[in-house]
């Protein structure tokens, strides 16, 4: 807890905003038994962190990929995100895109769609809930 309040005005709270990538207990399994941390990349085996055998036992884990997903996508470690007033709403955007930006020199925009239009969103929210 870093003092970020997220449950104001119906905004998502921290237990639901960040995706499965950074949750150590969450995996997605494809039909061939490959395990992924993100459902957006399911089927792309270069992102698989492990594979289940026919008995359902996890085979060797790709610790490099797993560690990147669990630890490298922290938006609080990003100077831009850590200073952004929208961080409590978006939590840094998509962790997979953040990891691709860091390790594969991609240039995905991870900012929330609310950035730049939050005042309008709040006005609409208040007008609908008054």
Locate predicted features.
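Radical SAM enzyme core and accessory elements
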Residues: 46, 76-130
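Functionally constrained cores in energy, signaling, and assembly domains
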Residues: 22, 53, 96-100
């Amino acid at each position: 807890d870093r003092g970020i309040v997220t449950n104001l005005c119906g905004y998502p709270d921290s237990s639901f905003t960040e995706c499965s990538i950074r949750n150590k207990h969450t995996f997605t399994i494809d039909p061939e038994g490959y395990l992924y941390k993100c459902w957006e990349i399911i089927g792309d085996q270069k992102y698989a962190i492990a594979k289940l055998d026919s008995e359902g036992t996890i085979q060797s884990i790709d610790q490099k990929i797993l560690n990147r997903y669990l630890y490298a996508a922290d938006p609080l470690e990003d100077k831009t995100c850590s200073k952004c007033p929208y961080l409590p709403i978006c939590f840094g955007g998509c962790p997979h895109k953040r990891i691709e930006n860091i390790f594969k020199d991609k240039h995905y925009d991870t900012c929330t769609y609310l950035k730049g239009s939050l005042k309008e969103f709040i006005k609409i929210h208040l007008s609908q809930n008054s």
